[in-house]
Regions:
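S-adenosylmethionine
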Residues: 87, 91, 95-187
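Conserved S-adenosyl-L-methionine
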Residues: 69-73
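Conserved SAM-binding loop of SAM-dependent methyltransferases across substrates and taxa
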Residues: 74-87
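Class I SAM-dependent transferase core
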Residues: 1-68, 98-115
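Residue-level recognition of conserved structural "scaffold" positions that shape functional pockets
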Residues: 59, 78-80, 175
């Protein structure tokens, strides 16, 4: 992790050290199980950590906000977000057992008390959340249909409870017909 990322995101020394440790754990685990594309692993800081932290430019979550990381894979964006938002509860889920086993191990080694992990399909959840975050897991319409009834009724943050989806490329067709959404340019 470079100094410019530390400055860009206003990381504390502890947050910086946790992100470095996270990166090391991902690199170690990635030798055994494909969490991050082998072609992309050398760009982990920019393409994965910085991308995950970019939410902090736009959202300042209040204490006890509940966030579901749908299809967390290698713990992205949930683990980096849990590091910079220690007052927020993150629930990281994935349908792939070996991935969620790794993510649970990483969260334990990082001592992230605000992270819960589960090997579960979103349709089997019986909890409610303020936000659902997801990084390139599925189309908006598929995520919407799976999660539309998962939100808490009371809004406690500046933004209305809902989805925070990390998308790339031209998303105009994907969001055609969606009444209300916001887009943010990252880097």
């Amino acid at each position: 992790m470079s100094l410019d990322l530390v400055q860009k995101f206003g990381l504390t020394k502890q947050q910086y050290n946790l992100l470095i440790h996270f990166e090391e754990l991902i690199f170690d685990w990635n030798k055994k199980i494909n969490l991050i594309s082998r072609k992309d692993i050398n760009n982990f800081k920019t393409n994965h950590i910085a991308h995950s932290l970019s939410t902090s430019f736009y959202f300042k979550f209040k204490s006890d906000t509940k966030v579901l990381d749908l299809g967390t894979g290698g713990g992205l964006p949930g683990i980096p977000m849990a590091i910079i938002f220690p007052h927020v509860d993150f629930h990281l889920i994935d349908k792939v057992r070996k991935k969620i086993t790794v993510v649970a191990d990483i969260a334990k080694k990082l001592k992230l008390k605000n992270v819960k992990t589960d090997w579960i399909n979103v349709n089997d959840l019986n909890r409610r959340y303020d936000f659902v975050i997801s990084r390139s897991v599925a189309s908006y319409h598929k995520i919407f249909n799976q999660c539309k009834n998962i939100f808490l009724s009371e809004n406690k943050n500046e933004f209305e409870n809902g989805f925070i989806l990390y998308k790339g490329g031209d998303i105009s067709d994907e969001f055609k017909g969606v009444a209300k959404y916001h887009t943010y340019e990252l880097f």
